[in-house]
């Protein structure tokens, strides 16, 4: 395909970002330094290679106020994206860039995750697939034990907030951001190469597209007291917005084969809540859903985390005197 060159421009993804360089007549100096090309343009039979992942990551950090100057930066992972993010950090004046690996090579100066906690880093960048859909909820770094952190950036974009980002938010890290905007930005900058023209206000357009994607992709979860109208409103909203409607209580019954009163009678509230958490975690990592939650879902923090990772949570605040009583 590359040898025939019967295309005008292409995007290249893993695992071909290095291999494609062999076919390029010209490689942008930045892409050459990183050792990866993700954008190839055919100019009169000659292939020109660029790396817009660099531009995308730089945009993400600039847009969210990540200041690398004089900082110690931890980069989690040793794959291809490590080189890209490391190049951005160094170009923006990082004082030190440290690599963290599950299997560190001391000769390369790599750190274990345990060692990383006491590194004194101000910025953490995750380039590993840890926490990526469908294996959500994974986080290998104890950010709560790193009080000097100023920013945590995760290039993973699905879910919207990985476990690393959720923990960073809980720890009060000033900037905690996932990778969706980086994905959009690299595509916009690749399009500039494809079309051979600069887009006016590209950063503004990137933010607009990212916001639109997030609105379209994220779940809407409804919480509130029993009989507050979550199911009724949920069905109406799902139909109006073109989303899949999920009633978690109904899903618990489907999965277990017993009614909710029967589950309570046989296993008590603890047994029911365990099943509720399992269903919340199952649906919470998906997208474009309208989720109606049981009244007691707020009793377990892990339920709210599961809903928060890929959605917004709305509280239906119906007046107490309007709620049903009994049964």
Task: Give the residues covered by each predicted segment.
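Phosphate/diphosphate ligand-binding glycine-rich loop within oxidoreductases
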Residues: 1-64, 159, 165-167, 171, ...
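Glycine-rich adenosine-cofactor-binding loop
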Residues: 49-54, 61-62, 66, 70-90, ...
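NAD(P)-binding Rossmann-fold cofactor-contacting core
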Residues: 91-109, 249-251, 255-256
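Rossmann-like adenosine-cofactor binding region
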Residues: 108-176, 297-304
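ATP-dependent small-molecule kinase phosphotransfer cores
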Residues: 250-308
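Conserved phosphate-donor/acceptor-positioning beta-strand/loop module used by diverse small-molecule
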Residues: 307-327
């Amino acid at each position: 395909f590359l040898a025939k060159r019967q295309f005008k421009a292409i995007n290249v993804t893993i695992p071909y970002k290095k291999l494609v360089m062999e076919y390029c007549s010209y490689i942008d100096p930045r892409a050459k330094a990183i050792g990866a090309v993700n954008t190839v343009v055919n100019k009169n039979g000659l292939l020109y290679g660029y790396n817009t992942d660099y531009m995308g990551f730089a945009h993400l950090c600039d847009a969210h106020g990540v200041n690398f100057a004089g900082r110690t930066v931890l980069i989690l992972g040793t794959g291809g994206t490590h080189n890209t993010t490391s190049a951005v950090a160094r170009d923006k004046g990082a004082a030190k860039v440290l690599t963290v690996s599950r299997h560190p090579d001391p000769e390369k100066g790599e750190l274990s995750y345990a060692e990383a906690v006491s590194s004194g880093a101000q910025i953490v960048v995750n380039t590993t697939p840890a926490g990526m859909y469908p294996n959500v909820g994974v986080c290998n770094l104890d950010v709560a034990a790193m009080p000097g952190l100023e920013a945590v950036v995760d290039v993973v974009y699905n879910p919207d907030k990985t476990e690393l980002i959720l923990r960073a938010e809980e720890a009060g890290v000033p900037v905690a951001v996932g990778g969706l905007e980086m994905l959009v930005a690299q595509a916009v900058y690749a399009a500039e190469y494809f079309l051979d023209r600069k887009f006016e206000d590209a950063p503004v357009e990137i933010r607009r597209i990212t916001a639109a994607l997030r609105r379209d992709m994220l779940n809407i979860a409804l919480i509130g007291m029993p009989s507050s109208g979550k199911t009724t409103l949920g069905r109406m909203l799902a139909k109006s917005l073109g989303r899949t409607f999920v009633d978690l209580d109904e899903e618990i019954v489907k999965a277990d084969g017993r009614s909710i009163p029967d589950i309570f009678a046989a296993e008590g509230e603890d047994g029911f809540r365990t099943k509720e958490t399992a269903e919340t975690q199952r649906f919470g990592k998906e997208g474009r859903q309208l989720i109606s939650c049981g009244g007691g879902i707020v009793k377990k923090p892990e339920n709210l985390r599961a809903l928060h990772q890929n959605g917004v949570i709305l509280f239906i605040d119906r007046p107490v005197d309007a709620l049903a009583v009994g049964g």
